[in-house]
């Protein structure tokens, strides 16, 4: 009997030791994958009602969790939106803080000791190096033991600036910044190969770090230009009577959908899917209806229709936002609450038990996701400093604002002294300006923007 008891104790010790090395899934430390569509207009998903675009994997993801159909990003092009996702700050607040940091750095001995040419280069490149002075969501996740990986679009020079522990974007050499493919380097360098070339870098990271909770910034340059999808995706839209530019854009949408499906299947095969929180958001909008032809239009072939990217219409800012986590978030839920993309980092931090930073604009929507509450946001206001220009695909500088409240969308281009009002419940593509018929509504929304502007603008 004495020997039997001793044997039991030894066996129990072995079991405890073996189990102690395993990190069991914990409801507070899920793996997190933030999926960011690049120039993916909200109408061009099956789950958003499109009869033209084939997106079966995104449809499955949307139906597996909570879909917010009235999500909004803060700006009409990618970089400000991506900055807001990683910091939780509005672009206008990010810019204000960056300018304050810039002013402080100009008074340091390090800056003052530079020669004139070096100071000029410092000024030109400070914006690309500025994020390293900010608190970021990946940096905060490290406090909970997360390993994080940046892949895809990333304008902020190096993945380390975002607080990631690993990544694909590793900066550029100043002397080569005006050479071949310089724009591709600015957008993320090798990071932009994810999905288009292979998902292998992110697979390798996950295999290496699967014993730790991980966060993935998954932002393929899709369906973004160039529209060079493999033929099998173009064949989906063959002989349907769509314009050539529609076929090319829709094919890129399906390409994005397929590489995401491959990523999800990779997680399922390795038993990592169940404890992974998936989040989806676009970086900005796009317009490409089946009968719109932009193939011979240099500006619109790169930026889509006039109501999408680099515009100040609803389509440019609106995005579906998805949260999916098996057995934790109820599936098949569609909500029409107004949700802001900066709510995403606040919600991620809340789910894993961390407080958001004081300068975060967004609020946690965890209770809404879990079905325990309703949204309290009655309006969303944003600004844009770029707008369409027939001479420059990057747009021209303006001061412009927009607001969504209930079924109304109002925009105000201060630079060009233009404003318009749309009933997007009945006119989602903003074709019929209602400002003459509803002047009191336009004035009220304009007053709300004016108040917001005074709070945000620094002289």
Positions of the model-derived regions?
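Formylglycine-dependent sulfatase
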Residues: 2-4, 11, 18-420, 428-454, ...
